UniProtKB/Swiss-Prot annotation:
It comes from Homo sapiens. It is found in: Cytoplasm; Nucleus. Belongs to the ANP32 family. The lineage of its organism: Eukaryota, Metazoa, Chordata, Craniata, Vertebrata. Residues 123-161 form the LRRCT domain. Residues 149-268 are annotated as: Disordered. This is Acidic leucine-rich nuclear phosphoprotein 32 family member E.
Amino acid sequence: MEMKKKINLELRNRSPEEVTELVLDNCLCVNGEIEGLNDTFKELEFLSMANVELSSLARLPSLNKLRKLELSDNIISGGLEVLAEKCPNLTYLNLSGNKIKDLSTVEALQNLKNLKSLDLFNCEITNLEDYRESIFELLQQITYLDGFDQEDNEAPDSEEEDDEDGDEDDEEEEENEAGPPEGYEEEEEEEEEEDEDEDEDEDEAGSELGEGEEEVGLSYLMKEEIQDEEDDDDYVEEGEEEEEEEEGGLRGEKRKRDAEDDGEEEDD
């Protein structure tokens, strides 16, 4: 597949301005030159063109935000000065497996002031005597050559290396994600537990008060019922007494009349 078609495929219905990473490995460069890549990819930070039969960087567009460039397994032999002009913020450059033979070719990379890591594996230049010492002396801005620093310490993973410049932002994000300091959640939990205990105490007090009110209410009602019954009994007793009095009065009047009748009979 030609590079131009590969780019259109990798866009995936996005505009070039939205693309930050672009992988064009194993496609075909017509006449060994870059095709289909232009200045509209202004947000591009990572570009990979490995094994695409690339021989010239002359048509590389301006990519000011580009930080990582993969150009391994091509047939590039020179013209590296274009990189400093078009990609001034490069931090990582992989030229492994190309046709780079001389230190003079690599010298053009001195103007890449932000370059930290350079790979030249399987290039003829690696066969030079004191190759590593010469490269570190020539390109004093780089920290890692072919994956190791001058003390033979291995370079970190590419992702960690890519994040070096953004460590401060990452720390801030981690702090935000970490949330409140240690002990803060425990204090909150203790406060919540205290609030819950207070609520429970209030509920218990309320329930006790409710029970007391119920007891008072029941006793009051019972007293009222008893009083009503007593009043009813008094009313019944009073009624019976009145009836007895009336009956007694009637009997007295009868006796009086009987006595009067007896007196009249004696007079006769």
